[in-house]
């Protein structure tokens, strides 16, 4: 079962997992990153995957560029007194929604205080976020958040491409021996996913009026996709 770019949409994700009868003991869940930002309930999403992996070691959670930005913003807030570059970059990508899911009183102005607090209050979660892998190789597919450089082997990629890449990956017709599942670049028109010869993009842009996708690959290797519009309780409203 594969999901990506949940962006704080916890209740939407939960609804889809229930609809496909996700069984954490028997099924393998692979999340392709971007669990945070934009939607309202990042805290619940992160904690869900953190606890899932703590209890069952066979589930896979990858680093998305939004987790990457969060990690860099926290590091900057803690270790440099003057620098704001990383925090600004993160807040331009709706980092405030994530901070507020942990600390509702957080604002752009007092964010440094709350980034520091997060590192103290949620040590285990922070360590987990820092150590998320950037890729995974399954029996039949490769998995990344954003993309790859096809001129290099799957295990010879650089961090930035795996987590941030759009082009030339998206236009490329080159392929590996296995198809790649990825998210990162929202598919904002029907069917809200994109299946190509070399890759499958499952970011349905649920926080942009699209849909959240959940992909089920059964034992025979058949692919089914369930979808949901974002539920109201996941929509972030500016306070």
Where are these regions (language model features)?
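Hydrophobic N-terminal alpha-helices or hydrophobic patches in metabolic proteins across all domains
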Residues: 18, 231-236
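Short, glycine/charged-enriched secondary-structure capping and boundary segments
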Residues: 15-19, 44-47, 75-78, 157-158, ...
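Residue-level recognition of the N-termini of beta-strands and the immediately preceding loop/turn
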Residues: 27-28, 59-60, 178
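Active-site flanking residues adjacent to catalytic metal/cofactor-binding acidic residues
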Residues: 4, 32-33, 63-64, 144, ...
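Active-site environment of divalent metal-dependent phosphoester hydrolases
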Residues: 7-11, 37-40, 66-71, 150-151, ...
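Acidic, His/Gly-enriched loop-helix segments that form or flank divalent-metal centers
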Residues: 23, 92-201, 205-210, 217-233
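Active-site neighborhood of divalent metal-dependent phosphoester bond hydrolases
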Residues: 38-133, 171
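N-terminal active-site segment of His-dependent metallophosphoesterases
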Residues: 1-48
